[in-house]
Amino acid sequence: LLKSVADLLDDDLSIASAGLLKNGGVAWVSIELPDNIQTPSGFTIRPQLLATTSHNGSLSTTFKQTATAVVCDNTLSWGLKNNGQVFRSRHSSKSTLKLGDARKALELVHTGGESIVSEIERLSSIDVTKKQFDLIVNQLSPVPTLGDSNQAGVTRAENRQYAVRRLWETDPRVTPWAGTALGVVQAWNTYNHHLKGAETSRTERNMMNTVSGKTDKDDDLVMEVIK
């Protein structure tokens, strides 16, 4: 995968990172433009193309538009059709990377940032009051009663709510956009990337969530609640 992608790069694109997941069963390569894009709302992104494939049959070969939020190193694909997916084929022993499809996907890196910037600006224009934010938090992470759960379940939900509210109120990765729908999505995206789950496996888990589409699903859920 790395060699196939490297052979297609032009002068404006470079390989940002590459690696293996699941004990070598999943491979990924991230290609990006050299310059960041700063939106009018002050949210800086770096457009990327993520190429992934698997050697264990767990994932299809996929080219997908994404972006990195520079302020927090979060991955996002907000505003992109099909969550940024531009090419996909089921992995098999006979499957090959078609150069035409790969070149088409790489061309979109140059324009992929426009849709994300447009969505960021749309979200930043939607006001969200503290009361509305609290309602959103309660909907996305409801605290169960002891009749429906045990004390551990109640505590986990309360801790999750507390962590997201702290991001909204005090964390510089979120506070510049607090009071807007952009701040809501950024708070949850940052929580999922940097606070949720065990710290020891965070880097690999975040990348696996990106290549598998889980990050997109988590963001879509927040977007749906905001509507």
Task: Spell out what each predicted region is.
Residues 3-4, 23-28, 46:
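Short, well-structured alpha-helical interface segments that form or flank functional binding sites
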Residues 19, 35-227:
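Intrinsically disordered, low-complexity regions enriched in serine/threonine
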